[in-house]
Swiss-Prot record:
Name used for this protein in its record: N-acetylglucosaminyltransferase
UniProt-annotated location(s): Cell membrane
Species this chain originates from: Azorhizobium caulinodans (strain ATCC 43989 / DSM 5975 / JCM 20966 / LMG 6465 / NBRC 14845 / NCIMB 13405 / ORS 571)
Protein EC: 2.4.1.-
Keyword Cell division: no
Domain of life: Bacteria
InterPro entries listed in its UniProt record: Chitooligosach_Synthase_NodC, Glyco_trans_2-like, Nucleotide-diphossugar_trans
Gene Ontology CC, one term: plasma membrane
Keywords, in A-Z order: Cell membrane, Glycosyltransferase, Membrane, Nodulation, Transferase
Encoding gene per record: nodC
Known role: Involved in the synthesis of Nod factor, a sulfated N-acyl-beta-1,4-tetrasaccharide of N-acetylglucosamine which initiates a series of events in the host plant species leading eventually to nodulation.
Matches recorded under PANTHER family: HYALURONAN SYNTHASE, MANNURONAN SYNTHASE
Amino acid sequence: MSVVDVIGLLATAAYVTLASAYKVVQFINVSSVTDVAGLESDALPLTPRVDVIVPTFNENSSTLLECVASICAQDYRGPITIVVVDDGSTNKTSFHAVCDKYASDERFIFVELDQNKGKRAAQMEAIRRTDGDLILNVDSDTVIDKDVVTKLASSMRAPNVGGVMGQLVAKNRERSWLTRLIDMEYWLACNEERIAQSRFGSVMCCCGPCAMYRRSAITPLLAEYEHQTFLGRPSNFGEDRHLTILMLKAGFRTGYVPGAVARTLVPDGLAPYLRQQLRWARSTYRDTALALRIKKNLSKYITFEICAQNLGTALLLVMTMISLSLTTSGSQTPVIILGVVVGMSIIRCCSVALIAKDFRFLYFIVHSALNVLILTPLKLYALLTIRDSRWLSRESS
């Protein structure tokens, strides 16, 4: 047995041990969750003022109109202001359609930026023009259930809760094999990862399609948020993760509200999906460094999770590279590694299907192949090109 074989088998053993420990600890924390945001208090009025921000850039008209209509249909009893910000679109048809339809609605503020400055700049412009107690960001390709504002606002009554997010669902789930996988990705990210993090008041990313923030918490952070840099360069993506980390750094809690459902359009082709994943991976690496610097504000579980996720990716990459290098050598190591990965994937898919009581998760085994062959190498590329701040999906639209 060669040195490469030994390294491959050791990496595999370490991966199995780490992944198993992580999932067991995560399951224990998910099962222990009783309050996903914070303790009830009278810090906010029963119906605080809510400002809903909808940044839009070259959005499809029907998609944007559907998004705005879902906000107008909220059952929330308090005052709502809706700010639609056109981020310098080259095609303003959808923005003008919304302006025309809601021109006489006093709840609306319409903002038109003279050039494309990015989602963060659009958010900042809306924040400066409003003064509500709570700020809800809704992506322009997202539709929210009618009780989302009510449920998110209710979860933020404790003064130490700075931000919360709702449950994300792929609106176009039935479009393709990929959208079905992404919908399952979202379910797992929300109902395993986020809900376990929420037990400790430390959801690490209040996802952009549907995230609510407390204005009094966010205001002192806006300068740092707006002018984020990484290695001396402006950082113009991953705004949701960065703002969440800044909230945690300032000592606020962040939470996940599974009953507040937001249905968002997801990539239905592999190329746009991979561009999105590349952007997200770079953002995650950038803010992981910041998160580890504020570990004193985080629970031991959150620190363990951050380390386990990154180390797990590294081990899986080593396993993949060694398997490929030994493919033609006659070694049994690639077979062992493949067997372990397939076996763990089957166990995971079956357990999730049983827990969720939804047997479509058996199909998620396809994602394991996608993860090993494409997403894990993509994460390595993201790390090697971490200084690249291009949005990618906009440039390709």
